[in-house]
């Protein structure tokens, strides 16, 4: 056989071995070629298979470099714990014969499978002792225990996350293989026994997976961990206690992740959880605040209870912190938790506890009772107020009747300072009173007096009087009402002048000095004038009187002169009128004379004409007679 054929066959064998390592579950049997038979099977058939599987070799080149980093840390930690476990197998120890009952949930599983050639015979369990959240951290010794193997079980590890609204619980599902490897349940029982020996477990409310926090390695490594949120606790007022009760909210939302990785070639796949357990030690002062679920409508009640330091024997009788998380466990969960607890050696613990609990009443019955009590109180208050109002209305009616009978429209102003008006400023407008008479604050007389003070020569119409009276009533009502509110604000039952002053100055810019404040009062003394000043004042008054008299005389003279002038003017006008009348009469007489003369002339002319005609007639008759 030639050399290139031998090299080719060797490469094929190496590739087949790599394929078998990558796929251990599939029993792939490929034909092996004999070196001495070059002409048996076709050479290119396995090459096709090689080309199909070649892309799967790429992650192998990157993973082995990082596998070595993650191989050492979990194994070293596990080797530190495993020797005392193997040495003390025959030693008498307390064994948890009752395995923890699993809490069955319906998680939404999201499986992520990664394959690698890395094979281990031990689970990568990272048990790191840690102390809870406290001001001081003290390491607790770990006692050797016996690990009992149990069949594969589904275990939920609730990790509480504290939020401002409704907290949620996330659980992780861990499945261990039954190939002789220690399961998670046995590890939990061992952790539980260690915690009990150190008196760190509350026997009534204990969950074996309460304090287990999970960590995840980088995504490039083959060791795939279980992803879940870590336990977060917020510190508040310190609570001195020797045990930490588990807190699980009532509305959990579970998210589970199942991861598988091959442990060895040819063996079924199993999970390799990387679990870091938190082993609480004996804390000196721990501050724990658990989430409190509230549902509206609720009435918050804050109670502070201080207990005398008690002495308890045995870890089963350890002090329980009450009120940290109400309505967490139901009866079934309490029964399941109680079944996982075993007896531990007794010890004496002195625990002075001071717990402050803040509870919320969420039941509907208590809410209805409180609402009924509030309604009854409101009804009683309304009843008392009605009685007070009726009494005040009666008193005010009597006073109003007395004022109206006494007369005087302005009398109603003084009535506004009555302390009864401070509680009910508008009692006069109450329609429930049948005999209610609205007093007029300002009558017509008062309005006329005010108008005369402003302008004495003017008068008012009836419409103006009505409008002014309405405006005055509104103004007085508004001022009294606002002043009453100020008096109520001062928690007083009497109306004072300063209330009215405050309202008038702020809203109307009206200042009323001389009331309320002592600073506004001023001392007034009569002035002492000397005699010279008095004489001067008298002389001044005389001179003023003389000047006034002389001015009056001058005015009288001027008036007389004016009257004389007026008389003269009238006389002149009368004379003129008389002259005109005389002239008219003369003209009329002349005209009459002319007319008479004309008439006489006409008569004479007529007579002459008649005479001439007679003469002519006579002359004519005369010759006829001659003939």
Curated annotation (Swiss-Prot):
Q: Which GO terms describe its biological process?
A: chromatin organization; RNA polymerase II preinitiation complex assembly; transcription initiation at RNA polymerase II promoter
A molecular function annotated in GO for this UniProt entry is: TBP-class protein binding
Listed A to Z, the keywords are: Coiled coil, Nucleus, Transcription, Transcription regulation
**The organism sits in which domain of life?**
Eukaryota
Report the leader peptide range.
Answer: none
Low complexity bias: where?
A: 91-121, 140-177, 246-313, 335-366, 415-437
Record's subcellular location: Nucleus
**Coiled coil located at which positions?**
368-400, 547-622
* InterPro entries from the UniProt entry: Histone-fold, TAF12, TFIID_TAF12_dom
Keyword NAD in record: no
Biased-composition ranges, Gly residues, are 404-414
Q: Where is this region: Disordered?
A: 1-39, 91-184, 246-439
Can you cite an annotated GO cellular component? SAGA complex
Q: Which residues form the Histone-fold domain?
A: 440-511
> Composition bias, kind Basic and acidic residues: at what positions?
373-402
Composition-biased stretches, type Polar residues, lie in 122-139, 314-325
- Describe its function: Part of the multimeric TFIID complex that plays a central role in mediating promoter responses to various activators and repressors.
Family statement? Belongs to the TAF12 family.
Q: What protein name does the entry list?
A: Transcription initiation factor TFIID subunit 12
């Amino acid at each position: 056989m030639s050399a290139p054929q031998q090299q080719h066959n060797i490469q094929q064998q190496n590739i087949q071995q790599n394929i078998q390592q990558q796929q251990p579950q599939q029993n792939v049997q490929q034909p092996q070629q004999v070196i001495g038979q070059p002409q048996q099977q076709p050479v290119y058939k396995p090459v096709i298979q090689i080309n199909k599987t070649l892309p799967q070799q790429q992650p192998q080149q990157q993973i082995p470099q990082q596998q070595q980093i993650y191989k050492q840390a979990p194994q070293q930690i596990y080797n530190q714990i495993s020797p005392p476990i193997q040495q003390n197998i025959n030693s008498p120890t307390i064994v948890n014969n009752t395995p923890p009952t699993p809490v069955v949930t319906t998680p939404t599983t999201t499986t992520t499978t990664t394959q690698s050639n890395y094979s281990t015979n031990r689970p990568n369990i990272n048990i790191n002792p840690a102390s809870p959240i406290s001001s001081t951290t003290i390491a607790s010794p770990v006692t050797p225990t016996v690990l009992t193997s149990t069949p594969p079980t589904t275990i939920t590890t609730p990790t509480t996350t504290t939020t401002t609204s409704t907290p949620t619980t996330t659980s992780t599902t861990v499945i261990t293989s039954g190939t002789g490897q220690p399961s998670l349940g046995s590890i939990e029982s061992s952790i539980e026994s260690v915690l009990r020996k150190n008196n760190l477990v509350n026997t009534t409310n204990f969950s074996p997976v309460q304090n287990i926090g999970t960590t995840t390695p980088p995504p490039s490594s083959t060791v795939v961990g279980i992803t879940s949120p870590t336990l977060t606790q917020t510190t508040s007022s310190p609570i001195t206690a020797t045990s930490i009760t588990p807190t699980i909210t009532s509305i959990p939302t579970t998210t589970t992740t199942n991861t598988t990785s091959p442990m060895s070639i040819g063996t079924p796949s199993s999970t390799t959880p990387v679990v870091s357990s938190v082993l609480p030690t004996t804390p000196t002062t721990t501050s724990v605040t658990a989430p409190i679920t509230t549902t509206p409508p609720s009435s918050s009640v804050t109670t502070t209870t201080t207990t005398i330091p008690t002495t308890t024997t045995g870890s089963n009788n350890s002090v329980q912190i009450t009120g940290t998380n109400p309505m967490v466990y139901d009866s079934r969960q309490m029964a399941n938790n109680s079944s996982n607890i075993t007896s531990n050696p007794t010890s004496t613990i002195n625990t002075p506890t001071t717990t402050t609990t803040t509870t919320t009443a969420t039941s509907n019955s208590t809410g209805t009772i409180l609402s009924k009590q509030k309604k009854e109180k409101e009804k009683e208050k309304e009843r008392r107020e009605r009685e007070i109002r009726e009494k005040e209305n009666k008193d005010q009616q009597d006073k109003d009747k007395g004022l109206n009978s006494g007369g005087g429209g302005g009398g109603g102003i003084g009535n506004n300072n009555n302390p009864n008006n401070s509680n009910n400023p508008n009692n006069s407008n109450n329609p429930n009173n049948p005999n209610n008479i609205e007093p007029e604050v300002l009558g017509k007389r008062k309005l006329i007096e005010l108008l005369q003070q402003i302008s004495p020569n003017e008068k008012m119409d009836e419409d103006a009087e009505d409008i002014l009276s309405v405006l005055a009533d509104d103004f007085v009502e508004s001022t009294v009402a606002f002043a009453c509110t100020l008096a109520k604000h001062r928690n007083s039952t009497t109306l004072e002048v300063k209330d009215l002053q405050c309202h008038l100055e702020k809203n109307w810019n009206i200042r009323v000095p001389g009331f309320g404040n002592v600073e506004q009062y001023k001392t007034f003394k009569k002035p002492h004038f000397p005699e010279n000043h008095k004489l001067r004042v008298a002389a001044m008054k005389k001179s003023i009187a003389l000047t006034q008299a002389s001015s009056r005389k001058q005015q009288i003279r001027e008036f007389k002169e004016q009257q004389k002038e007026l008389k003269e003017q009238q006389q002149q006008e009368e004379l003129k009128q008389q002259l005109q009348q005389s002239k008219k009469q003369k003209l009329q007489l002349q005209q009459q004379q002319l007319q008479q003369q004309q008439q006489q002339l006409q008569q004479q002319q007529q007579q002459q004409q008649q005479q001439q005609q007679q003469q002519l007639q006579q002359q004519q008759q005369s010759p006829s007679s001659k003939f």
